[in-house]
Amino acid sequence: MDQRRTVLLADASEEFRSLLREEIEKTGEFSVDIARDGNEVLKKVEERTPDLLVMDAMLAGLDGISVLRQLQKQENGPMTILTSGFVSGRMLMEASELGVAYFLPKPFETENLLDKMRGLFLQAPKETLPSLKTRVTSVIHEIGVPAHIK
């Protein structure tokens, strides 16, 4: 059974995708699939649910931020590292709000990306918070409101 982590690499540049895929797979730690545009990212995430998405912010079709908005609607979307040759404070803030784990400005060293990828998989899983309904029900019970009144 293959124990490698699955990575979806999304970038508009075929040359960049190819070179980065080769460097990442060379480690033997990751299996890499590629996407050329935002719509393909959404399709592949839905079909394969990768462990990690490494995505450029500037994609054809849907840009990276729009893809992140769509992925946020899913329950178990992949962890995400966002890359871009263009950096703005607004984009960084929005990416952070949408749950991006890391932002890497281009150009970057492949080893830097690999360090970030490895670090994400070594972190302890985040504690999941109870749903709003569960929390409201708990509070209602604590204050003694009958269960049929909500």
What positions do the PLM features span?
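Conserved acidic segment of CheY-like receiver
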Residues: 4-16, 20-24, 53
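Short amphipathic alpha-helix used as the core "switch/output" element in two-component signaling
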Residues: 43, 65-76
